[in-house]
Amino acid sequence: MKNGTVKWFNADKGFGFITGEDGTDVFVHFSAIQTDGFKTLDEGQKVTYDEEQGDRGPQATNVQPQ
């Protein structure tokens, strides 16, 4: 698991970006957020996540808000 901070997240569109500890921006889709109910993230929120290589670059999976 990696640690990061939510750079921005658009709840209407269901995606955003996490900035990893190494400064890399990682795409995050709402379906990767491991919470019950409405899946959204807040700017500046701390998260842990796994990372995989997507079609357009790094993508977060198994995102867990802290």
UniProtKB/Swiss-Prot annotation:
GO annotation, cellular component aspect: cytoplasm
Induction, per UniProt: In response to low temperature.
Highest taxon of source: Bacteria
Main location class: cytoplasm
Localization: Cytoplasm
GO molecular function: DNA binding
Alphabetized InterPro entries for the sequence: Cold_shock_CspA, Cold_shock_domain, CSD, CSD_CS, CSP_DNA-bd, NA-bd_OB-fold
Domain CSD intervals: 4-63
Listed Pfam families: CSD
Keyword Cytoplasm in annotation: yes
Keywords, ordered alphabetically: Activator, Cytoplasm, DNA-binding, Stress response, Transcription, Transcription regulation
Keyword Flavoprotein belongs to the record: no
Listed name of the protein: Cold shock protein 2
Organism per entry: Lactiplantibacillus plantarum (strain ATCC BAA-793 / NCIMB 8826 / WCFS1) (Lactobacillus plantarum)
